Regions:
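Loop-to-transmembrane helix boundary motifs in multi-pass membrane proteins
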Residues: 5, 38-43, 153-162, 170, ...
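Small-residue-rich segments of transmembrane alpha-helices in multi-pass membrane proteins
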Residues: 3-5, 66-81, 155-164, 250-254, ...
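Membrane-water interface regions at transmembrane-helix termini and the short interhelical loops
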Residues: 17-32, 45-67, 234-237, 260-268, ...
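Inter-helical loop and helix-membrane interface segments of multi-pass membrane transporters/permeases
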Residues: 1-3, 19-41, 88-113, 177-191, ...
Length: 355
């Protein structure tokens, strides 16, 4: 029964991830070309359909190296300009001081630092979605010895890319206040990236950088939909050997995804964030149980599992109704999160000792 619940939950997460990584590239491509955004939605969905239906080495495996290269070029180019601009005085990077360790959100009352920070910024820290992609990536490796550089290296690289872009956005718009003003004026992340790349990297560099920005979400979306197809097919024990069978599973998924594309991005992303962290929490407790049963030190998994339990329970208590929370006072959420974390720890230790 728990397995069925996790399958449904993972399918929901993958759908939300796929949807959230359609609008951004479509909007940016529409701005660059002047074509209607709906047309680009159809183009991106067409790619997703082929990537979802065909074997992973036919499309995804062939285009990923180029997309990854563009993404790394974009990050390194922007990072290099940050260093150059700060050295020459062209830009000013905000220094980390005691005063800067606070909530800079334009609406801090509705977006409290804890637990919102650990839900909105989730992929580079610990991610349930990325865990669902591990089997796909593992099948693409010729030898198990590549697992460490591939998975650990990807985690570190993603963290570096995220830090570069966070710094770039703050520096370009004149600090957190300017970044908030740009967001309040209706500038989406895709629009901001377009502005920064065109301003800092020149025309050629901007083209490659934009390619990386478009490729980054698309490479998450295609694998999300592919994993969702496999999960749904496995849940219903529906063979996927024939193309017709794959279409039977995929078509309803894409119909629902297309409808969801017209929802507010920030709302979808918060659902992605909390779903991501709940799945990561379950995975950490599972890994802790495995280590304990194997006679190994389990605290390396137990402590992060407790922290994420606190984060998830607190978020579900204090988040607004529209993003799945109960809109309770922050103190209630903090207490509930701590109690839940230690209660699960006590249950975990009790179960492990009985074994």
């Amino acid at each position: 029964r728990m397995r069925q619940v996790l399958i449904v939950f993972a399918a929901f997460l993958l759908l939300a991830v796929g949807v959230s990584f359609v609008n951004g590239p479509a909007e940016l491509l529409a701005r660059l070309t002047g074509w209607d955004m709906t047309l680009w939605l159809w183009v991106i969905f067409a790619y997703y359909v082929f990537a979802t239906l065909l074997p992973i080495d036919k499309i995804i495996g062939k285009v990923y190296p180029f997309m990854g290269g563009a993404l790394l070029f974009m990050a390194l180019g922007v990072g290099a300009y940050l260093i150059y601009g700060d050295a020459t005085g062209a830009i000013e990077m905000k220094e980390l001081t005691a005063d800067s360790l606070r909530n800079f959100h334009s609406n801090p009352d509705a977006n409290i630092l804890f637990p919102m920070l650990f839900v909105v910024i989730s992929c580079g820290a610990i991610s349930g979605f990325h865990a669902t992609q591990s089997p796909l990536m593992a099948r693409c490796m010729a030898n198990e010895k590549y697992a460490r550089p591939v998975f650990y290296g990807a985690m570190v690289s993603e963290g570096v890319v995220a830090l570069i872009w966070a710094t770039a956005a703050i520096a370009y718009f004149g600090g957190p206040e300017g970044l908030n003003a740009a967001a309040d004026a209706g500038k989406t992340p895709a629009v901001m990236v377009n502005e920064i790349c065109n301003s800092w990297l020149g025309r050629v560099g901007a083209v490659l950088a934009i390619l990386g920005v478009v490729a980054c979400p698309i490479t998450s979306g295609d694998t999300a939909f592919r994993s969702m197809r496999l999960i749904v097919a496995q849940a219903f024990r529906f063979s996927q050997k024939k193309l017709v069978s794959r279409l039977v599973v995929s078509v309803p998924i894409f119909v629902v995804a297309y409808v969801c594309c017209f929802m507010d991005f920030s709302t979808i992303w918060k659902y992605v964030g909390i779903s991501n962290q709940i799945l990561a929490t379950v995975t950490l407790w599972t890994a802790a149980a495995f280590l304990a049963r194997s006679g190994k030190v389990h605290w390396i998994m137990t402590v992060p599992a407790m922290f994420l339990t606190d984060v998830c329970v607190c978020y579900l208590c204090v988040a607004p109704y529209k993003v799945g929370g109960l809109a309770m006072p922050q103190v209630v959420g903090n207490v509930a999160g701590i109690v839940a974390a230690f209660a699960l720890l006590a249950l975990f230790l009790y179960k492990m000792r009985r074994r």
